[in-house]
């Protein structure tokens, strides 16, 4: 599967409308924000269709994966958008990560923890919030929002230290640039080591971190507590 897919799921009380853009989407947030309700509605429609009182609009099949038999169930799912609620421990396993990489499905995973085995983007971590778009209706409208937004820099960045994720061509490239500016460049030798390298810096240093945001999502739970 490639591309983005719009999903609308609703009943007489609540409506969710959002777009899935990549193969792994993470939904985070506190209790009572509508995460489990969303997954339950997807599952109810998948099992019972419109007789459930739920309407779902998407060009791809939306389904729910859960329980100890997840692998057998996943083997039968092809080109689907698969929702996984909190409490399914298999999402943390290397076996699940391998199955995701080998499949042609999209995955929407509800979790409050980082999934270190999965390469998901910082830009595909969302929360759920109520929107005033349908404020005149009794139906509550919910939408997804980016938890980690983009920051536009309007001033020149002048770091004293640059921490680069890799130790190969990326490191050599930025080292060559930074040496002209009398700036120290070090390699973290992997995304999981970046946070430790930042902690080793003095509090007065201006530090710039260069990492692949498309695979850095699982590390954000550490950074959000920093």
Each PLM stretch: what is its role?
Residues 83-85, 104-114:
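Structural recognition of the conserved hydrophobic beta-strand(s) that form the central parallel beta-sheet
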């Amino acid at each position: 599967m490639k591309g983005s897919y719009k999903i609308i799921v609703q009943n007489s009380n609540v409506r969710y409308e959002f777009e899935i853009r990549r193969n792994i989407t993470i939904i985070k947030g506190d209790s009572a924000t509508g995460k489990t309700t969303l997954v339950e509605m997807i599952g109810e429609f998948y099992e019972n269709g419109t007789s459930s009182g739920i309407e779902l609009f998407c060009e791809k099949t939306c389904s729910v994966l859960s329980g100890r038999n997840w692998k057998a169930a996943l083997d039968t799912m092809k080109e689907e958008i698969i929702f996984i609620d909190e409490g399914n421990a298999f999402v943390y396993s290397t076996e699940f990560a391998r199955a995701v990489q080998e499949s042609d499905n999209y995955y929407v995973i509800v979790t409050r923890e980082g999934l270190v085995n999965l390469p998901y983007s910082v830009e595909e971590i969302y929360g759920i919030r109520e929107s005033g778009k349908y404020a005149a209706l009794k139906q509550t409208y919910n939408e997804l929002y980016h938890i980690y937004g983009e920051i536009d820099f309007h001033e020149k960045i002048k770091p004293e230290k640059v921490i680069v994720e890799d130790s190969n061509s990326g490191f050599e490239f930025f080292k060559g640039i930074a040496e002209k500016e009398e700036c120290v460049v070090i390699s973290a030798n992997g995304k999981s080591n970046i946070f430790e390298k930042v902690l080793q810096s003095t509090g007065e240093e201006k530090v710039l971190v260069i990492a692949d945001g498309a695979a850095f999502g699982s590390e954000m739970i550490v950074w959000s507590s920093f």
